[in-house]
Protein backbone atom coordinates (compact mmCIF):
# COMPACT_ATOMS: atom_id res chain seq x y z
CA UNK A 1 0.00 0.00 0.00
CA UNK A 2 1.14 3.49 -0.85
CA UNK A 3 -0.16 6.91 0.16
CA UNK A 4 -0.16 9.47 -2.65
CA UNK A 5 -0.65 13.15 -1.89
CA UNK A 6 -1.97 15.77 -4.31
CA UNK A 7 0.44 18.13 -2.61
CA UNK A 8 0.09 21.53 -4.29
CA UNK A 9 -3.07 22.43 -2.33
CA UNK A 10 -2.68 20.07 0.63
CA UNK A 11 -2.48 21.92 3.97
CA UNK A 12 0.92 21.64 5.65
CA UNK A 13 -0.64 20.28 8.86
CA UNK A 14 -1.98 17.33 6.84
CA UNK A 15 1.44 16.73 5.30
CA UNK A 16 2.93 16.74 8.82
CA UNK A 17 0.44 14.06 9.91
CA UNK A 18 1.36 11.97 6.87
CA UNK A 19 5.09 12.35 7.57
CA UNK A 20 4.62 11.03 11.11
CA UNK A 21 2.43 8.15 9.90
CA UNK A 22 4.97 7.19 7.22
CA UNK A 23 7.80 6.83 9.72
CA UNK A 24 5.74 5.30 12.53
CA UNK A 25 4.12 2.63 10.34
CA UNK A 26 6.86 2.41 7.70
CA UNK A 27 4.47 3.30 4.88
CA UNK A 28 5.53 4.86 1.61
CA UNK A 29 4.18 8.38 1.15
CA UNK A 30 4.77 10.33 -2.06
CA UNK A 31 3.90 14.01 -2.44
CA UNK A 32 3.18 14.88 -6.07
CA UNK A 33 3.30 18.56 -7.01
CA UNK A 34 4.28 20.89 -9.82
CA UNK A 35 6.43 22.90 -7.45
CA UNK A 36 9.45 21.87 -5.40
CA UNK A 37 8.39 20.27 -2.10
CA UNK A 38 10.57 19.94 0.95
CA UNK A 39 10.15 16.66 2.77
CA UNK A 40 11.82 15.23 5.86
CA UNK A 41 14.76 12.92 5.38
CA UNK A 42 13.09 9.52 5.52
CA UNK A 43 13.31 6.40 3.41
CA UNK A 44 9.50 6.28 3.44
CA UNK A 45 8.79 9.82 2.22
CA UNK A 46 9.52 11.30 -1.17
CA UNK A 47 8.51 14.24 -3.29
CA UNK A 48 7.82 13.95 -6.99
CA UNK A 49 7.88 17.18 -8.99
CA UNK A 50 5.92 17.14 -12.25
CA UNK A 51 5.98 19.76 -15.01
CA UNK A 52 3.80 22.82 -14.49
CA UNK A 53 0.44 22.60 -16.14
CA UNK A 54 -3.19 22.00 -15.47
CA UNK A 55 -3.75 18.58 -13.94
CA UNK A 56 -0.15 17.34 -14.43
CA UNK A 57 0.04 16.17 -10.81
CA UNK A 58 -3.38 14.54 -11.11
CA UNK A 59 -2.32 12.64 -14.24
CA UNK A 60 0.85 11.43 -12.52
CA UNK A 61 -1.08 10.19 -9.50
CA UNK A 62 -3.65 8.39 -11.68
CA UNK A 63 -0.85 6.76 -13.68
CA UNK A 64 0.86 5.46 -10.52
CA UNK A 65 -2.01 4.59 -8.16
CA UNK A 66 -2.74 0.91 -7.55
CA UNK A 67 -5.83 -0.72 -6.07
CA UNK A 68 -5.90 -0.18 -2.31
CA UNK A 69 -3.60 2.86 -2.37
CA UNK A 70 -4.77 5.90 -0.45
CA UNK A 71 -4.80 9.24 -2.28
CA UNK A 72 -5.08 12.46 -0.27
CA UNK A 73 -6.79 15.10 -2.40
CA UNK A 74 -9.44 17.77 -2.31
CA UNK A 75 -9.84 17.48 -6.10
CA UNK A 76 -13.17 15.78 -6.85
CA UNK A 77 -12.39 14.84 -10.50
CA UNK A 78 -9.09 13.29 -9.36
CA UNK A 79 -10.92 11.41 -6.60
CA UNK A 80 -13.30 10.01 -9.23
CA UNK A 81 -10.40 8.73 -11.35
CA UNK A 82 -8.73 7.22 -8.28
CA UNK A 83 -11.95 5.36 -7.42
CA UNK A 84 -12.08 3.97 -10.97
CA UNK A 85 -8.59 2.50 -10.45
CA UNK A 86 -9.52 0.95 -7.10
CA UNK A 87 -7.78 3.55 -4.95
CA UNK A 88 -9.20 5.13 -1.81
CA UNK A 89 -9.40 8.94 -2.04
CA UNK A 90 -9.49 10.89 1.23
CA UNK A 91 -9.91 14.64 1.36
CA UNK A 92 -7.85 16.74 3.79
CA UNK A 93 -10.93 17.31 5.95
CA UNK A 94 -11.16 13.59 6.68
CA UNK A 95 -13.99 12.60 4.34
CA UNK A 96 -13.63 9.51 2.15
CA UNK A 97 -14.85 9.83 -1.42
CA UNK A 98 -16.85 6.73 -2.36
CA UNK A 99 -18.43 5.27 -5.48
CA UNK A 100 -21.80 5.98 -3.85
CA UNK A 101 -21.17 9.71 -3.39
CA UNK A 102 -18.75 10.78 -6.14
CA UNK A 103 -21.37 11.36 -8.88
CA UNK A 104 -23.31 13.76 -6.65
CA UNK A 105 -20.10 15.56 -5.67
CA UNK A 106 -19.09 15.95 -9.34
CA UNK A 107 -22.56 17.30 -10.18
CA UNK A 108 -22.44 19.81 -7.33
CA UNK A 109 -18.94 20.91 -8.37
CA UNK A 110 -20.12 21.49 -11.97
CA UNK A 111 -23.18 23.40 -10.73
CA UNK A 112 -21.04 25.67 -8.53
CA UNK A 113 -18.65 26.30 -11.43
CA UNK A 114 -21.62 27.27 -13.60
CA UNK A 115 -22.86 29.70 -10.95
CA UNK A 116 -19.41 31.27 -10.61
CA UNK A 117 -19.17 31.50 -14.41
CA UNK A 118 -22.41 33.48 -14.48
CA UNK A 119 -21.09 35.94 -11.89
CA UNK A 120 -22.67 34.54 -8.72
CA UNK A 121 -20.39 34.81 -5.69
CA UNK A 122 -20.56 31.32 -4.18
CA UNK A 123 -17.99 32.01 -1.48
CA UNK A 124 -15.31 29.48 -0.78
CA UNK A 125 -14.75 26.60 1.55
CA UNK A 126 -14.60 27.28 5.27
CA UNK A 127 -11.16 27.93 6.70
CA UNK A 128 -9.25 24.75 7.56
CA UNK A 129 -9.78 24.10 11.26
CA UNK A 130 -8.38 22.06 14.12
CA UNK A 131 -11.49 19.86 13.84
CA UNK A 132 -10.70 19.23 10.15
CA UNK A 133 -7.16 18.22 11.09
CA UNK A 134 -8.48 15.86 13.76
CA UNK A 135 -11.10 14.39 11.41
CA UNK A 136 -8.39 13.66 8.85
CA UNK A 137 -6.09 12.04 11.41
CA UNK A 138 -8.95 9.92 12.77
CA UNK A 139 -10.17 8.79 9.33
CA UNK A 140 -6.67 7.83 8.24
CA UNK A 141 -5.92 6.09 11.54
CA UNK A 142 -9.16 4.05 11.38
CA UNK A 143 -8.40 2.86 7.84
CA UNK A 144 -4.81 1.95 8.65
CA UNK A 145 -5.85 0.13 11.83
CA UNK A 146 -8.52 -1.76 9.90
CA UNK A 147 -5.91 -2.83 7.36
CA UNK A 148 -3.52 -3.99 10.07
CA UNK A 149 -6.32 -6.03 11.65
CA UNK A 150 -7.80 -7.43 8.43
CA UNK A 151 -4.94 -7.14 5.92
CA UNK A 152 -6.93 -5.71 3.02
CA UNK A 153 -8.54 -2.58 1.59
CA UNK A 154 -12.05 -1.67 2.63
UniProtKB/Swiss-Prot annotation:
InterPro entries: UPF0178 (IPR003791). Disulfide bonds: none annotated. Pfam families: DUF188. Belongs to the UPF0178 family. NCBIfam families: PRK00124.1. This is UPF0178 protein in pahZ1 5'region. The lineage of its organism: Bacteria, Pseudomonadati, Pseudomonadota, Betaproteobacteria, Burkholderiales.
